[in-house]
Amino acid sequence: KTTVREMEVLGIEPDTHMLEIARLLHQGAKALQTGFARLKANPLAAERDAAAVRKTERQTEKVYRKAIAELFDPEHYAQALAERRREPGDDLELLLEPMDQAGCSSVAKGLSFVMEALKRREIYRHLSNAADHLAHAGDILHDIVVKTA
C-alpha cells in the first residue's frame, strides 16, 4: 500500500520490472498462505510451500538487479523516453526557467535522468524489501515445520 502511494506521489508508472516483482510477491504470498494453512495436516507440503516462498525471493532479487542495471544505463533511459515519446526535462520546465536557454537542454536531460533513476530506485527498494520480509516469513514457516516434525 505504501509503495503504491509513493508511486503516486513520485509520479511513477509501473514498468515491466515492477510488474514482474509484484507478480512474484503475489506468488510468494499465496505459497506462504497455503503453507500455513497446510501446516498441521500436511507438514511436508507446508515445507514445499516454504521453499517456494524463499524461491520467489531469490527470483525477485534477480529481477531487482536487472532493473537497477537498466535503471542506471543512460542508453536504456533514452530508449525508454523515446518509447514514451517524452523529452527529457518536460517535467522540469519550472525548475529550469531562470537558467540560460543555451545550457538548459543538457542540464535538463541530465537532471531528468538522475531524478527518474532515484525515484524508480526507491520503488524497486520497497519491492525488494517486501520480498525480503516474505522470505523471512517463509523461514519462520520452515522453522515451525522442522520443530513440529
Which role fits each region the language model picked out?
Residues 1-149:
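Cytosolic, long alpha-helical scaffolding segments
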